[in-house]
Amino acid sequence: METPGGRPRKSACFPLCRAPGVFVFFAYIAAPLHIDELEQRKGRRGRMELKVYKDTVTAAESICDTKLELPVETEMLIPDYLPQVFKIVKCFVYLVVLQKQVTAGRLTVDGYLRCVVYYQSEGDESLCQAEQKLPFTKQVDVKPGSWGPATVLVSGETEYVNCRAVNQRRVDVRGAFALSIEAVAEAQGEVITALAGGGIQQRTTSLTGSKTVGSQEKLITAEESIAFDAPPEMVLSTQCTGAVNEVKLVSGKAVLKGEIRAEVVYRTAPGHTLVHTTRQIPFNEILDVEGAAEDCQCFAVVQPTGCTITGGSGEDEGENTISATAALYVKVYRPVEYMAVSDAFSTESETVLTQQQVALEEVADVFTQQVEAVTTGQLPDENARIIDVMATPLPMEVIEQDGEAVLRGRVMAHLLCINALEEIDCYDKVCEYTLPRRYPRPAADVIAQCYPSVGSVSARKVGDDTSAAIVLTVRGIVSFRSTQTVLADVQCTSPLVRDDGDIALRIYFAQAGEDMFDIAKRYAASPEAIAAANDTGSGILEAPQRLLIPSAT
């Protein structure tokens, strides 16, 4: 064999075993003469040209997770139209959130604490009720950044409350309320979706998540007439629960239908004999949600914030109207999937990879679940008689059991009893429950928005044993938070310098479970070329196999 200059070209071929399980073959051919070095450099620059294609993805980011303490300090004056105080029975503190918004790097929560005092009156010793609102506004800093729509969760429970009668018309209330605020926002980021040119080889991965199209909150009012078997002398409580029964998404709007169930507890005469009356209050609302479409999915919940009963006058005298206010919350989202490059190398050039962590949130479950919580035990006064029972649901939490995430909640039962002195006492008992839903994720990777409400409550005493059964309805949405490593940038630098001499062919003994891409990256060869040379697939190997690794040159 001769070169263009007339000189003989030297050639040789011989095998060489370099490492156990890998055989390589040398094929030596002398370099040709009279080739312009400038043209070689131009060709190398052309081979190193790399095209990078990027796309914008929506990533989830926790921007606030804090706990605050709200003081409960007030002097409640009993109006003249209510009986005087003989004995304080129980004091409740309820959280009512009116508005949540993120602006200028701060999260603002507006609302009030509804302080309700039950007392036994002077004279006829009847059960009475008085209440007062304690407004608050709290601002907290959020994580710096440019954020999209944010989901804000606000919950809380009473840490302690002390209530005493200063005199027959003045009640002093002192306590603290624990407020929990969590916020998860969406941030826009870029990922590499494809690479081309420069002998680049790439491995892609699928990123799945849920993109919030929009969310909206609105205070609504629903009214309905209500009839009582006998005129109430005093209304003691109006416990409300709500449900969204139908949701329809149209262009830029969400049409919702549902109802609010109001349970009115009252007495018709002096004393402590209580009567319960329930009323369903339907509502229809249309909320503007920019970007909402029929192919989107939706989670909606209604949380009652208050209820009033007014009597008729004039021609409507004798007719009563019940009016319920509630916070209607709607979240519209759409499942999304992105393809991102997670690894890459070049068969022609040295590559520099820059990685990044992408956090995604994916809606995994939207549910309405009924659950029963039961508590048993003995009352402090063995002669006490139960006259009524109420219940207060407490915030739910995500816990981990046997490597899975479960939703656990607590509810407090309040038993109103007549003691041996014919006075009214209230005994509290907390009971726990877990929902029969399990998620194959660590608890730290699960985001749960849960809204428990009490459907019914009953209590009975048999001998010395007392039991209370509470039926709750929990509405919620559960999302999984995941983090994946993908490439943020890829650069081809200098031409690839191979340190394997003039090896023309290798034999590699691959094991089951190895990825063809990893094998190809080790030898800077094309995965498709290796698969074609061995008549096999280019993914994960299912069984041990001997592979021929062709030269990349």
Where are these regions (language model features)?
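Intrinsic disorder/low-complexity segments
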Residues: G6-P8
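Short, Lys/Arg-enriched N-terminal segments with co-localized hydrophobic residues
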Residues: V22-R47
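Primarily a LysM-type cell-wall glycan-binding module
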Residues: S494-A532, G537-T553
